[in-house]
Each structure stands twice: as C-alpha cells, then as structure tokens.
Swiss-Prot record:
Cofactor(s) listed in the protein's UniProt record: Mg(2+)
Cofactor info, note text: Binds 1 Mg(2+) ion per subunit.
Positions annotated to bind substrate: T298, T299, T300, G301, R302, R303, R304
Job description of the protein: Plays an important role in the de novo pathway of purine nucleotide biosynthesis. Catalyzes the first committed step in the biosynthesis of AMP from IMP.
Species this protein is from: Prochlorococcus marinus (strain MIT 9211)
Main EC class the enzyme belongs to: ligase
Binding site for GTP: 12-18, 40-42, 304, 330-332, 412-414
PROSITE patterns assigned: ADENYLOSUCCIN_SYN_1, ADENYLOSUCCIN_SYN_2
Residues at which Mg(2+) binds: D13, G40
Name the record gives this protein: Adenylosuccinate synthetase
Amino acid sequence: MANVVVIGAQWGDEGKGKITDLLSRSADVVVRYQGGVNAGHTIVVEDKVLKLHLIPSGILYPETICLIGSGTVVDPKVMLKEIEMLIENDIDISGLQLASTAHVTMPYHRLIDQAMEKRRGEQKIGTTGRGIGPTYADKAQRNGIRVIDLLDEQKLRERLRIPLAEKNNVLQKIYKELPLDQEKVIEEYLEYGDRLRPHVVDCSRAIHQAARNRKNILFEGAQGTLLDLDHGTYPFVTSSNPVSGGACIGAGVGPTLIDRVIGVAKAYTTRVGEGPFPTELEGSLNDQLCDRGGEYGTTTGRRRRCGWFDGVIGKYAVEVNGLDCIAITKLDVLDELEEIKVCVAYQLDGQKIEYFPSSAEDFSRCKPIFKSLPGWKSSTAECKRLEDLPPSAMAYLRFLAELMEVPIAIVSLGASRDQTIVVEDPIHGPKRALLNI
C-alpha cells in the first residue's frame, strides 16, 4: 500500500490531470482535496477529449473510488453537468463520492466574485469569476452552505435565510445588482441535492476505511504551489491550499497517512491571470510556446502567459511540498527551439538571490538570471524510453533535476497516455530515489 499526493509545482495548468490519470491505474481511491470549478484538467482517452473541473481524473477507471473531499467547494450545477457528460461517454460513475461537509458555491457567490473583480479595475487579481473566493470566505466566516444542507429542506431554509438576505443587501446597495429570489434558490438547490444524494458520503471515514483495507490512495491537488493562499504570490493566488499539506486538511487525514509526494511541472512555465512572472516571454517566442503547447485555460479559455522554466520557484515547490520526485510535462513543446533558457537565480535591487521572495512587490522587481542550454531540434513525441530522447533533451532534464535537487519520475511528451516515459513508479518507488539518466 502507498498513499501519494500529486501537486502542481508552478502556477497551475502543469498537466496534473494526465499524471493523475496515469497514476490512477495503480490507485484504489482518488481524492480531490481543495479548489472548485476554477480548476480544470483535460484528459485524452483514445479519440475522446474530456474536460473536467470537479470530478477527479480517476473516474475513467471503473474500479476506482473518486472522492471530492471536504476541502473543496462544489458548484452542484457544474458537477451534475460533468456527470451527464461522463454518462454520455459511457463512463461508469458508480465510484463517484462527494463529501457531505464540502461547501457549496451559491449563485450569490458568483455574482459577488464577478462584481468585486470588475470594481477592482486595474488592481484586478485575475479571478475566474466562478465564486470560489466568496465561497471560501463564507466558509471561514461560518456562514456557508454545505452539501449536507442540500439534503434537508428545513435545514437549507434555516441556513440560507440570513446569508441570502445579507448577500442581496450587498448586491443591491454596493454593486447595484438585482437581488436573488429566495424561493427560486431553495427550489433549485434542493433539486441539486436530490440528484447528488446517492454520491454523498462522510469523506474522512471513507478514506480511513480504505486505508484500513490497505488500499492505494491518491490525493489530487488543483491549481499549483505558487497559487497557494499562504505560500503563493499573494494576493494573486487562489483561496485554498494546493500544497501537499492541504491534502491532510481537505481530506481529513493525518500526515502520517501520506507516503510520497509527487510534483508536476511543465518543461517551461505558464501563468493565467494577473501577478508577477519573472521569466515571462513576449513576442514570437511566447506565441510559439502558447500555440505548440495549446496554452488556453480549461476553465476560462484565457490565453496563458508563457515563459522559460523557473528553477527558483521549482526549488521552492520542492521545499514547501516535501517533493519526493517530479513529473516534467510538455517536453515536446520545446522540440523546435535552437536554445532553451532556465532561470537559476534572480537579481533583486542589484543583489543576486536564489530564493522566492515572500512579497509580491519584491517578486515583481526580480529579474531572471538565465542559464542557456542547447535545444535538440528534433521530435520527442514518439520516444518511449529515456534512451530514445535526443542527448540535448536528456541533458536538459538532468539539469532541471540537479537544479531542483529532486529526481524526475515521469516525462510527458504529449497529451495521450502512451506519450509518457515512466522513469520510476511514483506510487511504489522509494522516497527520494536517485535520478539515473
């Protein structure tokens, strides 16, 4: 038995969906532990392209239990649409489970999220407008609605009475929006509750039962380390904790249940929305990476900002998450480049630093110090073993591993499952295994 956490080591969109899908073959339970519909992952199975926001990637395996944990915030309308999409594609959803204590994104959360972002003007933070921040805010203020509340009309009415009145007041008086009709909201969300009822479980109890039965458990994070509420580029962050420690809180388990932590990072760097990005590229090279990498958000469709691999934030992700190994994705996107650069340090106000500044203002002033490496100018998409890669591609991977001081366990060379080189099984491999490439 081995229990593994998969996290994003950059600003999200690293390809966690594909890696989780790959690892789900060895997992009995897959747990999504934080985030909401602001995340998105794309899975390619044969000729099918499936885009999911809430439901874990492991749903493609009929024997796997897929659990949406207590640390997530759930938009039931979106979740039900995903269920319908999966059923239409003949995918068995009998293993899908939803934590009774997960908080629910209500219609006023979305309206307030969008209105707040519009009001910020030039100081916008780049929210997806899906209501995630306001949902987590209500949770922290003990004013939220949970999944279990949708299963009981009297409880929902009682729980919703004061929050809805307060939100309507805010919508009308501050944002000049129309108020929501309480009866319509109650009717709509009771229907969602009825449809989701068969999937609702006690999250922590379900996970501990699986652990007692010596099942392999995979904890799937959303977004990425640099978007973490406490450890990211605040305030340009998400409203939850994507780092590995968030798995314990969001799933209701102790840290001793976790055996290994695997990070996922692209062979370059991307970011969606606002916030500092030291290695960001401009012009034709940015366009080339964006087009070859298909860098458009699963959730918003927004074009991602592209840049060179940042080894400073890579090392930071290794430390903050306690990574045992890392998966490098989209190596093939670099196939046509003559020269590839990697950020090895920053210059901040004339001083060389090799750490991630805690202040977003300081981070925005950081200038990257690059190491240039030769490109390989040949396709890697069909390589099946490390030995098949061009020597310069091997050297690039070795450089990243040595820079971050973490072994590379997986190399992804495209969207399909078979475009993957597994160096070391992250679920059953030893902790901090040596890289041998």
